[in-house]
Amino acid sequence: MDYDPNTNPFDLHFSGKLPKREVSASASKVVEKKWLVKDEKRNMLQDEINRVNSENKKLTEMLARVCEKYYALNNLMEELQSRKSPESVNFQNKQLTGKRKQELDEFVSSPIGLSLGPIENITNDKATVSTAYFAAEKSDTSLTVKDGYQWRKYGQKITRDNPSPRAYFRCSFSPSCLVKKKVQRSAEDPSFLVATYEGTHNHTGPHASVSRTVKLDLVQGGLEPVEEKKERGTIQEVLVQQMASSLTKDPKFTAALATAISGRLIEHSRT
């Protein structure tokens, strides 16, 4: 019997050679799989962030368009509400085409009636909106006009197209009388206050107006006659001249009209 000195006599299963130590491949596969899962989750999160950013950008652009449309509609509404003011004469003139333009030309060339009264103003009967112009000192910031009626002020704000604030009034007979008015200094001619009236008074004014304005009905194509007042003089002439100067800034529309009104008012006031 051969004896091997390297043999452990107590190890019954010893084959005579030590096994090599090997690293398990399954452990490395598990680690690699975990990294792949993490990379996949990171990519998914990145895609989600990109999607949210893209959606946020679209919503921001949509909100900007909505705001632009809102401001455009708001400006249009204010322009329509004050379309009889000096600032909007040019806008209305551009809208006059065809038959309406012909009627306006016939009105300018026809004899013009005269009107001197407390709040007889440029009137649109269809919209029940009238506008009056009152001469005022540039230093006067009260935005109050003497039109023969009593009013209660309920608000004031700054508009986009005029540095002067706009004041809001209700008739003192409210709620039985629902007439409202807005008063703002003219942006083109600061020597005038522009009063826009909404509605018709269902009562007479408590006081007669000291100032005189001109009533011009652009819908009917003429000046509406009213009761002539006894008080006439230099105040009326100055007011007429100032109105003519303001209107004649648009030579295409108002030159002939302003000249005719100015001449006839001055001629009548001197008689």
From Swiss-Prot:
Keyword line: DNA-binding, Nucleus, Transcription, Transcription regulation
Location in the cell: Nucleus
Keyword DNA-binding: yes
Any single Gene Ontology cellular-component annotation: nucleus
UniProt keyword Nucleus, yes or no: yes
DNA-binding residue intervals: 140-206
GO function terms (MF aspect): DNA-binding transcription factor activity; identical protein binding; sequence-specific DNA binding
Predominant subcellular localization, coarse grouping: nucleus
InterPro entries xref list: WRKY_dom, WRKY_dom_sf, WRKY_plant
Pfam families: WRKY
GO biological process, one term: response to salicylic acid
Function text: Transcription factor. Interacts specifically with the W box (5'-(T)TGAC[CT]-3'), a frequently occurring elicitor-responsive cis-acting element.
Identification of the protein by name: Probable WRKY transcription factor 60
